[in-house]
Amino acid sequence: LSTVEPAKSPSESLKNEETDSLTSTFILLRSIWCTLWLSFLTMVDVSLRKAGREVISPRVKLWAQRLLKYADVNYVVHYEKPWSIEPGRRYVLMSNHRSYFDIPLVLAAIPGTVRMIGKQELFKVPIWGQGMIAAEFVPIDRNDPKNSMKSLTRAKRLMENGVLIWLAPEGTRSPDGKMQPLRKGGFLLARQTDAIIIPIGLRGTETVMPPTGFKINAGKYLSVHVGTPVDTALLSRSEKRELPLRITEELKKLSGEI
């Protein structure tokens, strides 16, 4: 589940020199081209050929792996406790959010059919947005409660069909690497579906692409820390109310903040 074992730790990669502007621009343009091309293919396959997840899911993985390869990114996955996907159960993956590179990292590193709930603005990007919708990614308007509930309903339907839903409960990228207050939508989704929450700590993605700007620094070593699953079906009412605090502390630990 991991790529080549890194020669340096994620913390050591912080000391690497930044990639020069020309190389960074080349990586960015290559990534954009790959994104647009695979998005276009997905739109065509879904709308004209009625392609299903057996076609689209490997393509999502391919896209994620290519973006990491273009940036010469290596990563390793650590499991706090081994787990496997139980047929018939619903899963909500929750991670910290420091960079746009969180997206390809999670999609490449986590097994199974993973789809993201993302802010609506991403889905307005021409071609990419339509490609994500065709691939069953779920847009959410954080400023419109009614539409947000529709998005959660759509996510529920995907979960009922074996899709693992991933979201960053902070709602946006952290400007300083520290956890921001978690939004309630993901926890509502987990409680309503008796889902198993998988906390995931992402380390080092902000060194590849900082939260401000689009410069890409190549050659970084990242790590994904998968925490102990939390089965919401086994929690009491009081424990469910404490879930946001519990997951906040878990994500801080897994992401290396504490």
Where are these regions (language model features)?
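Non-catalytic C-terminal accessory region of glycerolipid acyltransferases
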Residues: 1-21, 149-258
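Membrane-anchoring hydrophobic helices of lipid-metabolizing enzymes
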Residues: 3-91
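Generic preference for hydrophobic
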Residues: 77, 93, 116-117, 224-226
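Hydrophobic alpha-helical segments typical of transmembrane helices
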Residues: 55, 63, 102-105, 118, ...
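Catalytic core of membrane glycerolipid acyltransferases/transacylases, capturing the structured
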Residues: 38-50, 57-58, 62, 70, ...
